[in-house]
Amino acid sequence: MEWQEFERKFPQKLNEQQKEAVQSVEGPVLLLAVPGSGKTTVLVTRLGYMIYAKGIAPEKILTVTYTVAATEDMAARFASQFGTDMADRLTFKTINGICAGIIHTYGRKTGRTPFALLNDEKVIADTLAKIYQKAERTYATESDLQTVRTLITYIKNSMLTDVEIREMDKTADMKISTIYKEYNTWLREQKLMDYDDQMVYAYTMLQRFPELLRLYQDKFPYLCVDEAQDTSKIQHAIIALLASKTENLFMVGDEDQSIYGFRAAYPEALLSFEKNHPGAKVLLMEENFRSAAGIVKAADTFIQKNTLRHKKHMRATKDGEEVVKEIAVKTRDDQYRYLAAVAENCAATRADRVGGRSDNGTADASHTVAVLYRDHECALPLIDLLERKEIPYRMRNAEISFFTHRTVLDVLNIMKLAMHPKDAETFLQVYYKINTYIRKEDALQIARISETQDISVWNAAVRYHGLSDYTMSSVQNTRMHMQQLLTERGDKAVKRILYYMGYQEYLERCGLKADKIEILRILGSREDSMAGLLQRLRELQDILTRKETDYSCNFILSTIHASKGLEYDTVYLMDVTDGILPAQMLKNPEKASGEERENYEEERRLFYVGATRAKSELYVFTTGKPHSFCKELLSHPVTCRVKRKGIPSTP
């Protein structure tokens, strides 16, 4: 079947770049697709073209997607366009699904029993908690365990050497090399493997057993890979092995949208594609069908300053006025109040004109508004306001690890000790993190006296005669601060702990950041007492745990990561301030290491991905502090003033 006949039989509105991509079937092909360029349409249409125009049996094609949801979506779209019978003959899998098949086939061919897959999250968490406690000599919080899991995934997906793993101890705030080694030893002893091991074992099996590799190469001579920029080093290595016989590899991605470095995403594979696949063709899809021209132009100009990328330019297909604006507020709390007012307007529009428009034709109830932010905790003060005002919102991928982060727990434990001075166990957890200057052996004696005599730890310190005059003075000073905490507003209590009780110094000694403490301060500013803040935190944790998703709500809260691949009519980017987004600046680009440059450019990509979610309007919040990304993106900033009652003026 010729192209013209295929077009007539399966009509699709494709531009010239898309048509070229669809018709590029043989040999290695890298398709670089800018945001909103219709890459899924091209992938699905290309599969149909391979089958109907080129006569390739669908059983010979393997399509690799990043998530199970993407697998299901692509299969459904293919079935809708080309029929379910043909769709059922195609193979759509995640890389883990492919590896599970490889391991199963290995066992069947060799007669050996592969390790069983460990998919019980509780068993994994309990095991890692025991290993962490042994290595760190302290109990792991849920946040600590989440960090351990992320680092283990990173190590296995990045194919790190033992030397490189030990180097991670310097920056990981834990003995990750020890934890990693003990965890893997336990897995082997139990004859188990985790999801990341699936890839490690599958890769090893393909390398060591040529017959197994040939079987898969013959089974799938054509490979299509989606979201290649998010694929890890070991995943790319597996794909390269599978494609090495025919080199019929079609890889779709965009290094400008690679934002999963913490999960070991390996965009370098896209940059070195031509080197690794001689004779490769690199195609571009540069037309953005999603966003207004002003958004496209601003975002493209911004990302052009990255250096670790292919040369390409995003172009708009939509006309539109300049709709990229800065909202400059004095404080982060002003930002939250502004967004609460926006949410209230969305709710009113939805309630009054469901499916309709306002009198002036501008307020469509189906209009989607998304607030995008870097981390989940950035949204907590906004969620708090929305809940207080009973304003509806929809949240993507709620995350509650904030409440179990070690710095948050430290502050809460200090508050707890202020309220319960007889709590010797809590005293032992915090005494060395505030300016008591008590030695460990003395702290243990004080705790014992407190428990046996049923008195406060501060009275126990007085009765214990082993403290120097200087230390005793420090203890009395700490006791005074503890008493003051009971009389202060929530935010004042947080500031006292951080700046006057020595906790900031402890953070600096440990190389820890105080960013989460700032969120506590903002939440505390809405409470008349420290006890009120503690109660509100419990309520918020319960809300986030139990909240059901209202899919009809058009006001959405999401991290930028969770918004990837999605689009919204209006987007508000929160906290675009140096130190938050970007988390770190590249102070001296000429002297920056390769790793520093890579990390900074990923920060830029994260901002770029957030900006390109917007279809019609993009607003960027700044809070009076340096905001380099916003300055780069915008040429005509608009300042918003927040009224006394918290209702913003129109930007």
Located regions from the model:
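ATPase/helicase motor core of nucleic-acid motors
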Residues: 320-321, 351, 363-490, 504-508
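Short glycine-/polar-rich loops that comprise or flank the Walker A/P-loop
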Residues: 27, 56-60, 87-88, 245-248, ...
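P-loop NTPase Walker
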Residues: 1-113, 214, 297-300, 612
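Conserved helicase core region in the C-terminal RecA-like lobe
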Residues: 93-101, 224-227, 252, 375, ...
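ATP-hydrolysis module of ASCE/P-loop NTPase motor domains
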Residues: 87-89, 108-197, 288, 440-441
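Helicase P-loop NTPase motor core
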Residues: 35-43, 278-281, 286-392, 419-420
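Accessory C-terminal helicase-associated subdomains
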Residues: 360-363, 463-570, 583, 615-619, ...
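Conserved helicase NTPase motor core
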Residues: 3-7, 12-23, 27-38, 43, ...
